[in-house]
Each structure stands twice: as structure tokens, then as C-alpha cells.
Amino acid sequence: MEPQIVKFVFKEEMTCQCPKMSDSACDVDTDQNYFEEEVRLASFANFSSSYPVSAPALARAGFYYTGDGDRVKCFSCMAMVEDWQHGDTAIGKHRKISPNCKFINGFNNFRSDCIQTQAPVMQNSHANGFPNSAEDPGEKSSSEIMADYMLRTGRVVDMSKPKYPRHMAMCSEEARLQTFQNWPGYSPLMPKELANAGLFYTGINDQVKCFCCGGKLMNWEPSDRAWTEHKKHFPECYFVLGRDVGNVTRDASVQGSTYMNSYNARLETFSSWPFPIDKETLAKAGFYRIGDEDATKCFSCGGMLNCWAANDDPWEEHAKAYPGCQFLIEEKGQQFINNAQLQRPILHKANSGEASPALPKDTSFLKNPLVIYAQQMGFPLEEIKKVMGQKLKTTGNNYTCVEEFVSDLLCAQSETIADKPMKREISIEEKLRQLEEEKVCKVCMDRRITIVFIPCGHLVACAVCADVLDKCPICCTIIERRQKIFMS
């Protein structure tokens, strides 16, 4: 799946070391053509992915592409930077080379205010929460960053006239479905699934576009799921996040199979169900069986799921794959769906021919304080057992130190992810850039991540930013403790 131009605010911020900039670092002039971030991002259409910096990170930091090598230019202070190196951050480098830039100063001033006040409140009489005048781009950027920061840290932002959805005419799922009249027959995905995921057809090849964030997706593959790809490529889309953006779902009688809206009718389809997952739970979650294998389909949204495992929760899997299902929303509520979307992904179990040393019986094992602590952080029980087993095998002793245990769990998790086959080949430079971006604080986008939040277990912040947060910016869970970690 390859996303097209992303018309949204991006969070990653990685970039440069040997800058070459213009003579003046002062805001003597601005380039109004690149005032909007999405316009700056569009300028990177021919920006090579081999450079050790991502186009979204540069656009977020106020830069647009000049078309010459890796040279970029700030729309506000007009400073130019090129010869990017691994390990740089776009915002950090921008601050260094152009300390008087209004765009960057707006970001700095806002962060200082947040740290001092702990709970900043936006007070702005202008529509959209942004200045009406376009004469001061630095000020507007500051407001935009303020709103973005407050959203990421779980604070409430009151915008009387939000910028979303991008395409008001496509708020109705029925209207989106009508755009697929000429949908190419070679595409493996059905229009109904795409429309339910907030996407409408652009008329170009198999390209679709989100009515809310404006993000584009194309080159669909048989294994793709519309909601999954939408969430993966545009995780900040308000529609994906479950916010009320005016989406109008189709009536259940049109959307799915009305003759399956009865629990008993769905349950009857599982009469000869040989698979390990409970059929009653599947039927309660809205699913009925189709075919001879374990393929199931929701009577309401029409979403299909298969390859069920014994420990799967049908409600959670339903919420992960098809969060827009009206039946799901009515039965479980939006909060349940949001939690499922933010839930830590289950890692594949590693197959090994070697037997691990026997661990204590589950009853005593589960009472181990280290096991309880790791589970509170979100590590899967199978992963915990595997790491403890390896420790016993290599040393003959179990863990006594929390820091060592968590460090080994993180390493094992990284190795498991690294062992997964890649969907597409990417360059060494791209891999290095992605690894660097994963380690950057998702709040300041500058310093390294060094804190894990307890009990949710999310790794998102540096020590400075973690101190001013009361809730996890990913799942909004109240932070009870902050555990310092060391990432290699």
C-alpha cells in the first residue's frame, strides 16, 4: 500500500548535521505560497527517500523542497539547509540555524507555556482557532502547533470551525459508495469496505481518498484491509481516531445481511464449528459463518474476519478491523473501540525447536511481581514466559532486577519484529531513518525517548516532557509511575 500526498499533520521529526543556509536568518520576508503545511509537503513529490530525513518531518518543521539535491527552505525565515546527515532533527536544526525564525519561536514559546502552566487553555476569538490575517505566518503556525500539542497530550481543544472533514459532500457513507460506479474490477477490495472506512473513489486507477483527512491510498493488495491501511498510513485522521466528524453510516438493512440481525440466526451458521474460538461469542459480536473454513462476516457492516485463534476476543478484533460498524458502536460504545484501536499489537510467537526450561506453574508464575509488572506495561504473557525461560536456560537463575527484565523484553520484542518478513524491500538508508525516528520523543520531537509510562507501557516521551504529562498522550491513561529506560 503506497499513500499518496498526505494532507494531514505529521508527527515524526528527523533530519541534518552539516547545514548550508542563506546569509540572513531573520524574518525579513516570507514565502506565502508555502504557508500551509500540506502545500509544503506536496513540494517533496520528487524528494528521494534515500535521504536520511523524511519529507513529512521537513514540512512539519516549516521547510519546502527547492528541487535541488536535498536542499530545503523555510517559508518563514527563508533559511536554506542541505547535506542532511543521520541523527538530525528538523525542528532542532531549524532552531539552531535560524534562532529568530517566527515559525520556530512560536513552537518554543508554546512549549515553555505548557511546561509552566501544566494545563494550558486556548483563548482565541478567531475562527478555527487561528488568526484571520495571513500577514503573520509565524503566529498562525504557533497556534496550529499549540492545538496539535494539546491534542497529543490529551488536552481539550475547542475549535468552533474545525478544518475537518476535508470533503463535506462525502460525509455520507452512501455518497462515498456511489463514487465507486467505475471501480476497476482488478482491485481485490470491495467498494462497501472502502466506503465504510471513510474512503471514496477518485476515478484514478484504484486510488481512494479519505473524506476527513484527505489522505490518498492506492495499489491495493489481496491481504489489505481498508480500515487497517487507513489507520496505518494516516493514524492522526480524526475519523480513524473515532472523533465525531459528521460521518453518516448506511442503514443496517442496506449495509449488511438483515436476515442475520438475529443472534440465533447467526449462531445456527456455526452448527459444525471445529475451530478453537467460542462460536457464541462470535455470534454475539455480530458475526456469522461463511464457507467451510473459519471465515466470518458481520451482519451490520459486512466486515469479514478469519484465521481466528483461541485467545482472540471477537469484540476487540471487530473494533480493530471495522471501528465504524454501527452495531459495534451501539453495543460496546466509542470508548471501547478507541481502546481497541490504541491497544498494543500482539506479536507473533517465535517457533523454536529447542525446549525451554520449565517455568513455575501458572498459578505461582502469574503472582510473580516481575510478571505482574511486565503485564501492566502491556507485554504479552507468552513473551514474558519466553524471556524468563531464556534467562533460566542461559544463567540458571531468574530475574531479580526490574530494569534488566524490561530491557530484555524490549530487546526480544525488537528481534521479533525484525524477524517478520517485510511487505516491501526498503533501502538501508530508509531503515536507519525509521529507526532514528522511532527513538525520538513524540511530544517535543527533538530529544530521545527515555521514559516508559506505567501502567500503560507506552514509550513516547523524553524525561523533560514526561515530567509535565499527567496522562499518556497515546491512550490517555493516567500515569501512575515513570520508569527510566536506556535504548541502544
From Swiss-Prot:
Record flagged with keyword Secreted: no
GO biological process annotation, one example: negative regulation of apoptotic process
Transmembrane segments: none
Chain positions recorded as Zn(2+) binding sites: C298, C301, H318, C325
One Pfam family hit: zf-C3HC4_3
GO-annotated cellular components: cytoplasm; nucleus
Compartments where found: Cytoplasm; Nucleus
Entry-linked PROSITE patterns: BIR_REPEAT_1 (PS01282), BIR_REPEAT_2 (PS50143), ZF_RING_2 (PS50089)
ZnF (RING-type) residues: 441-476
Main location class: cytoplasm
Assigned keywords, A-Z: Apoptosis, Cytoplasm, Developmental protein, Metal-binding, Nucleus, Protease inhibitor, Repeat, Thiol protease inhibitor, Transferase, Ubl conjugation pathway, Wnt signaling pathway, Zinc, Zinc-finger
One GO molecular-function entry: zinc ion binding
Cited InterPro entries: BIR_rpt, BIRC2-3-like_UBA, IAP, XIAP/BIRC8_UBA, Znf_RING, Znf_RING/FYVE/PHD
Domain of life: Eukaryota
EC number(s) per entry: 2.3.2.27
Catalytic activity, reaction form: S-ubiquitinyl-[E2 ubiquitin-conjugating enzyme]-L-cysteine + [acceptor protein]-L-lysine = [E2 ubiquitin-conjugating enzyme]-L-cysteine + N(6)-ubiquitinyl-[acceptor protein]-L-lysine
Repeat region (BIR), residues: 40-105, 176-241, 266-329
PTM annotation, UniProt: Degraded in a 2-step mechanism; a caspase-independent first step and a caspase-dependent second step. Stabilized indirectly by MAPK, which acts to delay caspase activation, rather than directly phosphorylating xiap.
Entry remark concerning the domains of this protein: The BIR and RING-type domains are dispensable for anti-apoptotic function.
Entry-linked PANTHER family: E3 UBIQUITIN-PROTEIN LIGASE XIAP, INHIBITOR OF APOPTOSIS
Role according to the record: Multi-functional protein which regulates not only caspases and apoptosis, but also acts as an E3 ubiquitin-protein ligase mediating ubiquitination and subsequent proteasomal degradation of its target proteins. Acts as a direct caspase inhibitor. E3 ubiquitin-protein ligase that acts as an important regulator of innate immunity by mediating 'Lys-63'-linked polyubiquitination of ripk2 downstream of NOD1 and NOD2, thereby transforming ripk2 into a scaffolding protein for downstream effectors, ultimately leading to activation of the NF-kappa-B and MAP kinases signaling.
Subunit structure: Monomer, and homodimer.
Similarity remark: Belongs to the IAP family.
Descriptive protein name: E3 ubiquitin-protein ligase XIAP
Encoding gene, per UniProt annotation: xiap
